[in-house]
UniProtKB/Swiss-Prot annotation:
E.C. no: 2.5.1.46
Gene3D superfamilies in alphabetical order: Deoxyhypusine synthase (3.40.910.10)
Listed name of the protein: Probable deoxyhypusine synthase
Coiled coil regions in record: none
Alphabetical list of SUPFAM superfamilies matching this protein: DHS-like NAD/FAD-binding domain
Essential cofactor(s): NAD(+)
Any Pfam family the entry gives: DS
Encoding gene per record: dys
């Protein structure tokens, strides 16, 4: 893939140039930044990017992950054997609903192989979760121990990479944890699981304040993007940052905001090396991550 990056560099224009520049920023960050965040949204895990992300974590390109509940849902469902099939953006959604199928973009997922698979996985672990107070990164590690190394959570657990999920209740895993606590009231007289998100914040505070230089690859937007740049401001901002997104900035959304906007908030340093790649992540992330593996 490094040959592709070099080709993009020679093309020297438009988003090809931005991809080549993003590679250079991330390559330097691997050698200079001791804290390297990887932020991505859950929809990417519904694609084959899941295995590429897992490889990047096995290679320890990054040592902190911030993601969404959907990433856990798709990662677990796939590990449990759920079928994710290629489809079309133009499929009839009413017909899909009648057939018991979900559509995520142009990926089709069986309704019975999504939520139920995730719920079964979580509920099978209720016994060892009851009565404990866990941060989301600790829950992710607990789940990762039981998942294969080609999964994101499995790779992260084996590599010692913390996975933070600030919006963990916003998905099948969160609902399954609620069901887990409902079962605890019936079977154990109230020995519930407590998900302590402030414990996550304490850990992030230690990571950020303990780091010398901060880097981030941020794919997509939303809570996973903002949580990284929010914490970076308490260290003076990110030193290296690459955004990959197709969102626009002109509606004032966080998802479309460029790195330069984060400078005004103190979340990216004025001296930071930054690149914004306006592209579908499924097109450019494999190139960047594969080129970086082994560096």
């Amino acid at each position: 893939m490094r040959e592709v990056v070099e080709l993009y560099k020679r093309i020297g224009g438009f988003q090809a140039l931005h991809v080549a520049q993003a590679y250079e920023v991330l390559k330097e960050a691997l050698g200079e930044a001791d804290v390297r965040f990887f932020s991505f949204t859950g929809n990417l895990v519904a694609t084959g990017l899941r295995e590429i992300i897992a490889e990047a974590l096995r290679e320890r390109l990054f040592n902190v992950v911030v993601t969404t509940a959907g990433a856990l849902d798709h990662d677990i469902a796939k590990a449990m054997g759920a079928s994710y099939r290629p489809g079309s953006f133009d499929l009839d959604d009413y017909e899909l609903a009648e057939k018991g199928l979900h559509r995520l973009g142009n990926v089709v997922i069986s309704r019975e192989e999504y939520g139920p698979y995730v719920e079964k996985f979580v509920l099978q672990r209720c016994e060892r979760l009851w009565g404990r107070s866990l941060a989301t990164y600790e829950l992710a590690e607990e789940f990762g121990r039981d998942l294969p190394e080609d999964s994101i959570l499995g790779a992260a657990a084996r590599a010692g990479v913390k996975v933070f999920v600030p919006g963990i209740v916003d998905g099948a895993v969160g609902t399954a944890l609620l069901t887990c606590n409902d079962l605890a009231r019936v079977r154990r007289g109230g020995a519930r699981l407590v998900v302590d998100v402030l414990k996550d914040e304490e850990a992030l505070r230690e990571i950020v304040h303990g780091g010398k230089r901060l880097a981030a690859l941020i794919v997509g937007g939303g809570i996973s993007k903002h949580h990284v740049i929010w914490w970076a401001q308490f260290k003076g901002g990110l030193d290296y940052v690459v955004y990959i997104s197709t969102a626009v900035e002109y509606d004032g959304s966080l998802s479309g905001a460029r790195p330069r906007e984060a400078v005004s908030w103190g979340k990216v340093k004025p001296t930071a090396k930054s690149v914004y790649v306006y592209a579908d992540a499924t097109l450019v992330l494999p190139i960047l991550l594969k080129a970086l593996c082994g560096k």
